[in-house]
Amino acid sequence: MERLENCAQMFQRKFLNEAFRRHCPVLLACIALGGSLLKELSPLPDSYWNNKRNVLNVYFVKFCWGWTLWLLLPFITLTNYKLTGSITKVLRRLSSLLVGTLFWYLCTNLFLYIEHITGSCYESEALLDSIEHQDRKECRLHGGFWHGFDISGHCFLLSYCILIILEETSVIRSIQFERHWHRMAINAQFTALSILVIIWVWMFLCTAVYFHNIFQKVIGTAFGMLAWYITYRWWYLQPISPGLPPASASHSEKEPVYKN
């Protein structure tokens, strides 16, 4: 258990710290722009990471929101209850995950709709001979290649999940442990979320340097950052909202940190 605690402290000190939280939106924007320019001006040679069948893409990125939701659900429950002692406040905070799910659903479907209305079906990726098909599904069913404006869903969701995790894990610095199992459970969840952030940042970088064009990646990243800004920087500050994590709320209101 000591190793787990040391690991959690290391992640808190080196990765999920206040400086990283504050500068992460700028970092993501730089990765999206820098990686896109690298892809356009000096493409990297093929590697394991531009193979869509790589293990992180197949087992993690494909289920990006599921992994984020699955790990944040118990973390928010335990940490928010320890800081507030109120089941009502915990349920209110958990509703932020429903809001995140709604943003994920709406944006994903919007991207698919844009790709549909801007796309056409072709016989191959060379985009030489077009085929008459109504939509992407029908096109692919008949062996065609659908080409439209494909906003990067990876850039959107990875950036959004990274920023959400950073917001929700900010409570870790405010918790004082009295019980061993509290420390063990929360440290384990915090460590898992820290590893997940590292995976998401790495795969965001891989997407930036290997896939899509610059406009598709920048727009996808902008949607992810906008969804985060609308919620955590504006709406969650309002009385009728899921609210900010307890540490963030008390910090912004200049109140003493919650203790249990």
Swiss-Prot record:
GO cellular component, one term: endoplasmic reticulum membrane
Transmembrane helix found in the keyword field: yes
Record-annotated active site: H154, H212
Topological domain spans for side Cytoplasmic: 1-23, 79-93, 166-189, 232-260
This enzyme's EC code(s): 3.6.1.-
Segments on the Lumenal face: 45-57, 115-144
Catalyses which reaction(s): an acyl-CoA + H2O = an acyl-4'-phosphopantetheine + adenosine 3',5'-bisphosphate + 2 H(+)
Keyword annotations: Endoplasmic reticulum, Hydrolase, Lipid metabolism, Membrane, Transmembrane, Transmembrane helix
A GO term, aspect molecular function: diacylglycerol binding
Segments crossing the lipid bilayer: 24-44, 58-78, 94-114, 145-165, 190-210, 211-231
Keyword Lipid biosynthesis assigned: no
Compartments, record wording: Endoplasmic reticulum membrane
InterPro entries membership: FIT (IPR019388), FITM1/2 (IPR046401)
Source species, domain of life: Eukaryota
GO BP of this protein: cytoskeleton organization; fatty-acyl-CoA catabolic process; lipid droplet formation; lipid droplet organization; lipid homeostasis; lipid storage; phospholipid biosynthetic process; regulation of cell morphogenesis
Pfam families hit by this protein: FIT (PF10261)
Bilayer disposition of the protein: Multi-pass membrane protein
Family: Belongs to the FIT family. FIT2 subfamily.
Function (record text): Fatty acyl-coenzyme A (CoA) diphosphatase that hydrolyzes fatty acyl-CoA to yield acyl-4'-phosphopantetheine and adenosine 3',5'-bisphosphate. Preferentially hydrolyzes unsaturated long-chain acyl-CoA substrates in the endoplasmic reticulum (ER) lumen. This catalytic activity is required for maintaining ER structure and for lipid droplets (LDs) biogenesis, which are lipid storage organelles involved in maintaining lipid and energy homeostasis. May directly bind to diacylglycerol (DAGs) and triacylglycerol, which is also important for LD biogenesis.
Designated name of the protein: Acyl-coenzyme A diphosphatase FITM2
Designated gene of the protein: fitm2
